[in-house]
C-alpha cells in the first residue's frame, strides 16, 4: 500500500484543508504498472475532509484510464447518512467506482449492514467473498432499510436530523478548541463532514503517540495521527510534516465530556510545546 501525500492550504482562521496532489498521483500511476486500485474516503476519516466534486470526477477518470477500480468509502457521505456540512458536494458513481455505504451512521450500527454500489460483476464477486467470510449473514438491516430507501425517507431523516445534529456538535467543538488553544500554533482541518476533527499542533515538541499516552493518564482518549498515514514504508509518507503532529478527535460525545477533554488536551499541549 502506498499513500500519496496531500497538498495543504492554510487559512487565516487557524484552519486548513487537504487537496489531492494530482501531479504526484499521476506521476506514480504512470511509473508503476502494479497499481491495482485507488482508495479514498468521502467524507474522510480522520480529517473530516470532503473531496471536491472535481477531485472525485478526476479520480474516476484516472481509474478508467488505467483500468483499475476507485474504491470510495462513503460511510458518512451522501445521500445518507449525509454527515456532510458543505453545500457543493454531490453523490457520484460511474462504472469505475466501487462505492461502499453503511447503515451504522444512520443509527443502526448493530445490524452491521454494508451497501455496495458497483458494476454487476464486482458486486457479485464481493457477494461471494461475503458468503465465505460470513456464512449466514443477517438480513434484518436490509429488511428495515429497504422500505426507507425505496420511499426516500432515509434521505430525509439524514438531512433533517442526522446532519444538523452532528454539524452543531462540530461547530461547538471547534469553538472550544479556539478558546482553549488560544495563543498556540494549532490548526484544525475544516470540518466538512464525518464525526471527527483533525487537529494539527505544529509546535508540539513530542510525537502524538507520546501525547496520546500523557492524555490517557488524564482520562482523555484520542487517536494519534501516525496510525492514519498508511504506506509509511514509503519515505515520502514518513517525511510528511503532519505525520506525528496530528490527533483525531471524536466530537460526538456528551458536550460536557468533549469540552473537558479539549480543555485537558490544551493544557497538556501547552506543557509540551
Language-model segments: what does each one mean?
Residues 1-273:
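PLP-dependent class I/II
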Amino acid at each position: 500500500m502506498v499513500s500519496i501525500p496531500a497538498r495543504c492550504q492554510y487559512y487565516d482562521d487557524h484552519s486548513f484543508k487537504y487537496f489531492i496532489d494530482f501531479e504526484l498521483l499521476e506521476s506514480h500511476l504512470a511509473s508503476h504498472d502494479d497499481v491495482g486500485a485507488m482508495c479514498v474516503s468521502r467524507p474522510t476519516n480522520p480529517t473530516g475532509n470532503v473531496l471536491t466534486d472535481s477531485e472525485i470526477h478526476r479520480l474516476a477518470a484516472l481509474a478508467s484510464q488505467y483500468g483499475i477500480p476507485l474504491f470510495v468509502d462513503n460511510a458518512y457521505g451522501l445521500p445518507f447518512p449525509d454527515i456532510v456540512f458543505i453545500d457543493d458536494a454531490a453523490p457520484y458513481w460511474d462504472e469505475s467506482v466501487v462505492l461502499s455505504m453503511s447503515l451504522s451512521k444512520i443509527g443502526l450500527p448493530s445490524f452491521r449492514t454494508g451497501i455496495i454500489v458497483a458494476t454487476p460483476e464486482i458486486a457479485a464477486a464481493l457477494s461471494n467473498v461475503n458468503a465465505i467470510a460470513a456464512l449466514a449473514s443477517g438480513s434484518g438491516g436490509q429488511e428495515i432499510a429497504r422500505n426507507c430507501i425505496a420511499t426516500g425517507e432515509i434521505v430525509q431523516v439524514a438531512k433533517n436530523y442526522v446532519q444538523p445534529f452532528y454539524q452543531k456538535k462540530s461547530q461547538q467543538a471547534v469553538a472550544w478548541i479556539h478558546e482553549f488553544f488560544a495563543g498556540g500554533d494549532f490548526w484544525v482541518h475544516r470540518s466538512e463532514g464525518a464525526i471527527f476533527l483533525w487537529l494539527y499542533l505544529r509546535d508540539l515538541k513530542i510525537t502524538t503517540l507520546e501525547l496520546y499516552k500523557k492524555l490517557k493518564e488524564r482520562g482523555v482518549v484520542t487517536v494519534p495521527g501516525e496510525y492514519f498515514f498508511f504506506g509509511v514504508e514509503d519515505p515520502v509518507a514518513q517525511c510528511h510534516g503532519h505525520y506525528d503532529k496530528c490527533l483525531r478527535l471524536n466530537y460526538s460525545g456528551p458536550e460536557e465530556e468533549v469540552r473537558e477533554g479539549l480543555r485537558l488536551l490544551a493544557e497538556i499541549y501547552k506543557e509540551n510545546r
